[in-house]
Amino acid sequence: MHVKIKAFEGRVEYDFKLDNGDGGHPDGKTKMENISVYFKNPLINEDIHNDILCVVALLIVNPFIANKLSFSIPVSNKFVTSANKMLSKYKIETEIDHDLTPREIPNHGRPGLAFSGGCDSSAALCIMPPETVPVFLERPMSE
């Protein structure tokens, strides 16, 4: 799958293009097609680190990727290396900007957890630090 990403003041756009084998969900019921989505928020600015923009894309489409994921914007080497250590079903194969400094944790940053409400994410939340923010990514299911 290839993801085209554009960040503007107040808006981020994602254009997802499937490769052969992409689009199926492990549940066998849900499918993904080529789609464009956007997020509007006044806090969004064009200075969002590329690694953050790409991890958002990864979280949106993770279950639907068959072999590889690439992005239209370069990412840090640390992002690709770290993500590929965690991924087992597919790998990230994209342009690496060796001059791009990996995103640092802000001084008052808090850990986040992609939270589904299921057993695994509930267990993960139990062992995370108390200041962890559980983030639920709403994926409306078709009937």
Regions found by a protein language model. Name each.
Residues 4-143:
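ATP-dependent adenylation/nucleotidyltransferase module used to activate substrates
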